[in-house]
Amino acid sequence: MTTMTVPPSLLPLEPFPTAPDTRASTPHIRLHGLGKRYPGGVQALREIDLEIRRGEVFGIIGRSGAGKSSLIRTLNRLERPSEGQVLIDGEDIGGYDGQRLVALRRRIGMIFQHFNLMSAKTVRQNIALPLRVAGVPRARIEERVAGLLQLVGLEEKRDAYPAQLSGGQKQRVGIARALVHQPQILLCDEATSALDPESTQAILALLRDINRRLGLTIVLITHEMAVIREICDRVVVLECGRIVEQGEVWEVFGDPRHAVTRSLLGSLRAALPADLQARLRQAPGGGDPVLLDLQYTGASRRVPDLLAIARAIGQRVDLLHGGIERIQGRALGRLLLQVGAPPGELPGVLAKAALVADKVEVLGHVAHA
């Protein structure tokens, strides 16, 4: 990954208050009993309890209508909760209004799916706009904007208009604009959904670099598990306004417990190929080999060792399908093995297979082609 040097002009316009030592162990963001109800009785969020650590990249995923946007918009009070609390650095923001609310929103930047750039203003002018509104002196605005252009890699596009930019470049402008007030938290509302795959990867890499270099806490919502896998430290899964699963990314990917999570992960997991599915039988017939599913959840930090698998099972083993990926330093995935074991020896084979995988499942017997 490219090493990024933070420009000197990215020093805060105004120094942030020094946090007391007791805040080092305090969640940066804490939600307690959070609920959101819209007119007409629509309950968008229900009993949300959540803690987000300082400096982490935290993902919120769910299907359309799950409550993702409602949740993220309560963090900067674009939406007022109907019940419960939102605490930033241990302080309930529910009663904020006027200047306190303005100050809060300057500490919390936000980027959006559709960029929200002003078409008649240049890149430089779009980035500078929040500072002009805040009455920052022109010289400091120019210095700050120059540093942000360097940070997001748009120095050569400073005088371009949004219509002259690609989708990825527009989102870089959005990121720069969100950082003008030196926020401590960055909210990302489907920030890559309108981008092509190459631009998505570039924006995610930029966000991760910004997280590491500036120490930002990043909270992002998405419906794409690939985005969670690429950038997040932890994730929650929402369904019908409730949290149905949460944990470290490797935990949720390696051993999803809820049906919604498994559905969202479907396209990323090694599914049983159609030709094998057609030949699969639950009852053995005429010496048909058994199909074993060796699963690696990351819990044991075990790495698939094909030689050890063959030795442990002690039978003829064919690797028919599978996939292993590394997430947060752990090997996750599955191997589908065809094992020529007689029915009487199957219990022993399963016991041995359990020594070399986190989970073992018999999928059936493979009929001869």
UniProtKB/Swiss-Prot annotation:
Chain positions recorded as ATP binding sites:
62-69
Q: Which reactions is this enzyme annotated as catalysing?
A: L-methionine(out) + ATP + H2O = L-methionine(in) + ADP + phosphate + H(+); D-methionine(out) + ATP + H2O = D-methionine(in) + ADP + phosphate + H(+)
Which controlled-vocabulary keywords does the entry list?
A: Amino-acid transport, ATP-binding, Cell inner membrane, Cell membrane, Membrane, Nucleotide-binding, Translocase, Transport
Q: Report the InterPro entries cross-referenced here.
A: AAA+_ATPase, ABC_transporter-like_ATP-bd, ABC_transporter-like_CS, ACT-like_dom_sf, MetN_ABC, MetN_ABC_transporter-like, NIL_domain, P-loop_NTPase
Task: Return any one Pfam family short name.
Answer: NIL
Q: What class of enzyme is it?
A: translocase
The UniProt record lists the keyword Nucleotide-binding: yes
Where do the ABC transporter domain residues begin and end?
29-265
Q: Which family does it belong to?
A: Belongs to the ABC transporter superfamily. Methionine importer (TC 3.A.1.24) family.
Q: Describe its function.
A: Part of the ABC transporter complex MetNIQ involved in methionine import. Responsible for energy coupling to the transport system.
What binding partners and quaternary form does the record give?
A: The complex is composed of two ATP-binding proteins (MetN), two transmembrane proteins (MetI) and a solute-binding protein (MetQ).
Designated name of the protein: Methionine import ATP-binding protein MetN 1
Q: What is the lineage of its organism?
A: Bacteria, Pseudomonadati, Pseudomonadota, Gammaproteobacteria, Pseudomonadales
**Gene that specifies this protein:** metN1
